[in-house]
Amino acid sequence: MALEFNKTSYLKIYTGEDILFEDIPLYKAILREARSLGLAGGTVIKGIEGYASKVRGVGRAVSTFISGNANFPVIVELVDKKENLEKILPFLEKNATHALVVMGEADYLVTD
């Protein structure tokens, strides 16, 4: 039996765990908004290290060993049809400060 892949779109939002929307982390606000819009799925991935050409975040943590806190990179991945993902773009444009937003297409296969 040949595997059959389908087409989908994804939206990735790169930000930091210290970036807030109102009083909650931005990544939680994005997931909450995506859920309220009925998007197919979302995942938050916490990185252990990263860099960008521009400094993001309010206070840059030098090291967890020295300062006791950390500012780890966070990636929010949303998957759905492109027209559905576009519903969250106004929210991101208004509220996703210090973020990089990437949209693309992918092939997917769901396994049991």
Outline where the language-model segments fall.
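Positively charged, small/polar-rich N-terminal and surface patches that mediate targeting and assembly
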Residues: 1-112
